[in-house]
Amino acid sequence: MRPLIGITGNQLLEAVPAFSGISVAYTPIGFVKGVQAAGGNPLIIPIGAPETAADYIAKIDGLLLTGGQDVSPNFYGEEPSLHIGATFPLRDDFEMALIEEALKQKKPILAVCRGLQILNVQM
């Protein structure tokens, strides 16, 4: 059986005409294809309430933390600087809960770019 790999999703923070102003959840296709090429089945995990993290982690064999917005400096005791990009605190909260659960449930974590940053903040 192929391992089920949870891939953290993202959300467009601004309305995009192509989607008629509808909020869109997504993940870059490269992560999906990479998991498939490595022999896994990808499962995109949409941003949700932190209390749902345990359920998601229980269903997957590994977690892939993807890139995206900057991690909010509030989570590591700093003030925003002039050079910070967009932040998404709801995503930060949810992904930190996913990381906490993955560690509790001894599930492997692979982190890329922002994913490595949020992993570092959580640890």
Q: Which residues does each predicted region cover?
A:
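N-terminal beta1-alpha1 cap of cysteine-dependent amidohydrolase-like domains
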Residues: 1-112, 120-122
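Catalytic nucleophile loop
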Residues: 116
